[in-house]
């Protein structure tokens, strides 16, 4: 996080929320671009710096976006910066545009679509395989994109490790909104630096009122996160299972409370007790179910 920008945010903070109109006026962000018409997501620019404002209709989701940013930091997962904000009509989240000059950005969806188009008509089952979005076929799609580079094996290994880390984080936080459109791969123009961009759109985490969209290797309309975890445990390599177990053990209630404290420090105020209580309740409910799945898996191992 840019400390100078954080200082500017805090100067415009009122009751934990940043007054967006005041911030834009004082810091001369006078260029605006509408990113999503339906949700009124806008990006504001000052020179080469951009901030994005996303209105939220649900107060819980507004707070969770910031809490998940702080939780991801504690787990050493690269996440876009989020804060609380409001304008004349709405409350919402402010984030900083992580895009830089001399870099290209591709959604995982773009890469999978290119892979499907390339192989269409050559393999009879390829479209069905690709649309399951399982880890094996994502590996194939990445191979199809990068195999011509000398260090393609290193690149693909790095990307797959990052993807599994994000996947485990989403499982543990019940993120209902991760999909191939908001998983972004960033490439330097000379292709010496290729990785996943910081994760974003985490407002539906630890939320049992939403239907999961995280359909990796399953039909999301028929399965839940716990079925997804069971399939992951039974079909993944030991290396990836170890990643999940390490994150599961690290993400305990004390870490969630640390993320809440970090959020309160960031916004210079206290989170509503109702929000904290709901978060902690959802954490324990989720933890208990995951514990059952892991125990069943251990029994199968024996």
Stretch-by-stretch model annotation:
Residues 1-33, 153-158, 188-191, 270-302:
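Regulatory N- and C-terminal appendages and interdomain linkers associated
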Residues 3-126:
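Conserved ATP-binding subdomain of kinase catalytic cores across diverse folds
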Residues 28-36, 132-148, 211, 229-238:
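A short, terminal or domain-edge coil/loop segment
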Residues 60, 134-211:
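Conserved kinase catalytic-core segment
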Residues 73, 189-302:
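C-terminal catalytic region of ATP-dependent kinase domains
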Residues 99-168, 278, 289, 298:
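ATP-dependent phospho-/nucleotidyl transfer catalytic cores
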């Amino acid at each position: 996080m840019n400390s100078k920008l954080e200082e500017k945010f805090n100067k415009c903070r009122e009751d934990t929320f940043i007054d967006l109109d005041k911030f834009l006026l004082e810091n001369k962000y006078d260029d605006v671009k509408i990113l999503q018409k339906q949700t009124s997501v806008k990006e504001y620019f000052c020179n080469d710096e951009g901030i994005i404002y996303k209105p939220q209709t649900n107060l819980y989701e507004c707070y969770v976006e910031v809490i998940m940013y702080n939780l991801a930091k504690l787990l050493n997962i690269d996440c876009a910066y989020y804060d609380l904000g409001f304008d004349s009509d709405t409350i919402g989240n402010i984030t900083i545009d992580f895009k830089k000059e001399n870099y290209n950005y591709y959604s995982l969806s773009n890469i999978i679509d290119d892979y499907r188009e390339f192989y269409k008509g050559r393999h009879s089952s390829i479209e069905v395989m690709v649309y399951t979005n399982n880890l094996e076929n994502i590996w194939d799609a990445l191979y199809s994109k990068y195999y011509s580079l000398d260090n393609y094996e290193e690149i693909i290994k790095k990307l797959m490790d990052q993807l599994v880390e994000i996947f485990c984080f989403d499982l543990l936080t019940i993120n209902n909104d991760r999909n191939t459109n908001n998983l972004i791969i960033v490439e330097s123009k000379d292709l010496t630096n290729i990785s996943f961009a910081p994760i974003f759109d985490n407002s539906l985490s630890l939320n049992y009122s939403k239907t999961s969209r995280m359909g990796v290797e399953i039909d999301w309309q028929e399965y839940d996160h716990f079925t997804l975890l069971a399939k992951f445990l039974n079909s993944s390599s030991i290396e990836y299972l170890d990643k999940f177990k390490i994150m599961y053990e690290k993400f305990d209630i004390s870490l969630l409370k640390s993320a809440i404290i970090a959020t309160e420090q960031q916004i210079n105020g206290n989170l509503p007790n109702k929000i904290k209580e709901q978060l902690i309740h959802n954490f324990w409910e989720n933890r208990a179910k995951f514990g059952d799945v892991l125990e069943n898996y251990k029994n199968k191992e024996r």
